[in-house]
A protein has these predicted regions:
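Short, small/polar-rich motifs associated with maturation and membrane association
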Residues: 1-347, 359-361, 429, 521, ...
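Proline-rich low-complexity regions
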Residues: 40, 180-181, 389-390, 394, ...
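Outer-membrane beta-barrel strand-turn architecture
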Residues: 229, 315-318, 352-356, 436-440, ...
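Beta-sheet entry/capping signal
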Residues: 309, 320, 441-446, 504
Length: 558
């Protein structure tokens, strides 16, 4: 027993000695932070990365901080290169000189028909890098852009898979629509179909001076998307995977059935009418009777989503390449048969240096989206499920759908047996860019690109077979749309530096043209228990089609 007590006392003393020893080893260091000209760096950040303790430099650039032998001080200031100090270099009266980050000053930003140094920009242009969007648990690039730059407002109207968020740059506009112009590797494209893992850089052109080169179509702003290219340094294979769940988080609160009955009685009595519920009925609701929150019954507890991205990149001094494949699967939060979205992406980016004067780059991209949803309007389903009192069960004791008095529909029945709407689209695009160095600083650039977009919607809305059901129609809808767009441009550019001065000029010509075609047809039948192929044909039919061609010729200069 004495041996056990002695071991316990010894262990306790050792534990007490450890923090005392650590306290004795900590010490105070101090210093001053200056720039290369000797001026104090007021507000410079000093952080001990090992203890997460920090401070900032005062009006004279001075600071002091308690450190331990394992401390590493990270000194930083906006526009300057960070500096790390550790070990024996940590002492009193340190003089720390931060060097200007010339790489930030020389950073190139993608603008209309070219690039410019960030320091030379006069328009409102924001640049979004890969690090700001990668790793986000989103299903499309638009969602990944939320919160990345000021003035870019993205709103998600609903949670349905494949829903298109609205994009507004610096507020709303009343000219045609509010969508900004989106260019992907130089040609107009659909931002919804871009794989977020393929992005190298995004530039957002916000004001008139930065968008003027694109004309009136850029009145709502411009989003320029540049995809990744291969590197000559090494070959890489990259695989990314994300898996998660979506959960309804903000559903309307519906009162319990017995509270509804009590409040309903109170409202009727106050208006001079007899009560609708007896005390026995209220007690029945309170003690195991119906208490069904319809809005909660139409949603799943959680809906999984996943994405997989595989890329191969590499090359040598003359040729670089990047090949990427992507897959995304998002389940709908609504109950029903296999509702959700699947997206498939494929991309090839190839660059080749033919000679010291001539090089070219080609991009080929394909995306397929498949979205399956219920065949009714979502507003109808949510509205009916929200207003239904909890005294009515959504299904009876036999599992049959109920149609309470005053309602001829059942939201869950529409989701599970009311048919479906299937939307499929294919987006194929390709570009070829070439550059010829004519003289020192003088270059001739050309680009040709095209996009083929096909969209098909198939809807099979089925009647809900039940005595009290008001959903008695079967409706079959078929829609198809195709657009083919072609873009070409030729530019002559001149860029020359003389010491600290730079001269830049550009003149160009572009052609854009396209062809759009589509049709829409639908049929409606009644008195059928199944679908459009069986039942009495009604006069409610429709057929329509449309087609158009357009072209734009432009000259531009900067």
């Amino acid at each position: 027993m004495k041996h056990v007590i002695m071991c316990f006392v010894t262990s306790l003393l050792l534990l007490l000695a450890i923090p005392m020893s650590a306290q004795q080893q900590s010490r105070l260091v101090s210093g001053v932070v200056k720039d290369e000209s000797g001026e104090p760096m007021i507000g410079a950040s000093i952080l001990d990365t090992s203890t997460k303790q920090g401070t900032i430099a005062d009006m004279d650039g001075k600071f002091s901080l308690e450190v331990t032998p394992s401390s590493k001080l990270h000194i930083s200031f906006v526009g300057y290169k960070d500096q790390v100090i550790s070990g024996k270099a940590l002492k009193k009266d340190m003089i720390i000189v931060l060097k200007s980050n010339t790489e930030m000053i020389d950073e190139l930003v993608v603008v209309g028909y070219g690039t410019q140094k960030k320091v030379n920009l006069t328009g409102a242009v924001a640049s979004v890098s890969t690090s700001e969007i990668e790793g986000k648990p989103v299903t499309n690039l638009v969602e990944a852009l939320q919160g990345t730059t000021s003035g870019l407002v993205i709103q998600q109207s609903n949670s349905a898979p494949g829903a298109r968020p609205s994009i507004n740059i610096r507020g709303l506009n009343t000219m045609n629509n509010n969508d900004p112009m989106v260019l992907i590797d130089g040609i107009i494209g659909d931002i919804q179909n871009v794989n977020p893992s393929d992005i190298e850089n995004i530039s957002v052109l916000k004001d008139a001076s930065s968008t003027a080169i694109y004309g009136s179509r850029a009145s709502n702003g411009v989003i320029l998307i540049t995809t990744k290219k291969g590197s000559a340094q090494k070959n890489e294979v990259t695989y990314e995977m994300q898996y998660g769940w979506q959960t309804p988080t903000c559903l309307p609160k519906v009162v319990d059935s017995w509270i509804y009955a009590e409040m309903r009685n109170e409202a009727l009595i106050n208006s001079g009418q007899p009560a609708a519920f007896t005390p026995e009925q209220i007690a029945y609701y309170r003690n195991g009777g119906p208490n069904c929150k319809w809005i909660e019954e139409i949603y799943k507890k959680n809906a999984p989503q996943q994405s997989h991205n595989l890329s191969f990149s590499g090359g040598n001094d003359k040729t670089t390449f990047l090949v990427s494949l992507g897959y995304m699967d998002q389940n709908s939060m609504f109950k029903g048969p296999d509702y959700g979205q699947q997206r498939y992406n494929g991309r090839l980016n190839l660059s080749h240096k033919v000679s010291d004067r001539f090089n070219f780059t080609t991009t080929v991209a394909y995306a397929r989206n498949e979205v399956k949803d219920h065949a009714y309007w979502t507003e109808w389903i949510i509205e009916q499920a929200t207003r239904m009192p909890a005294i009515y069960p959504i299904v009876d004791e036999n599992g049959a759908y109920t149609f309470p008095s005053g309602s001829n529909s059942n939201a869950l029945a529409r989701l599970e047996q009311g048919g479906y709407r299937q939307n499929s689209n294919d987006d194929f695009s390709a570009t070829l860019n070439a550059e010829l160095k004519i003289w020192d600083g003088l270059k001739l650039k050309g680009m040709i690109g095209g996009q083929l977009y096909n969209n098909r919607t198939h809807e099979n809305r089925k009647a809900i077979v039940a005595p009290a059901s008001g959903d008695t129609e079967n409706r079959m809808t078929e829609q198809f749309a195709r657009s083919l767009n072609l873009t070409t441009n030729v530019m002559l550019t001149y860029d020359k530096s003389f010491g600290k001065h730079t001269i830049g000029a550009m003149v160009g010509y572009s052609y854009e043209g396209g062809s759009d075609k589509g049709y829409d047809t639908y049929r409606v039948t009644e008195t059928s228990d199944f679908d459009i192929m069986v039942g009495t044909q009604t006069s409610n039919v429709g057929n329509s089609g449309s087609g158009s061609d357009w072209s734009i010729y432009s000259e531009f200069a900067r």
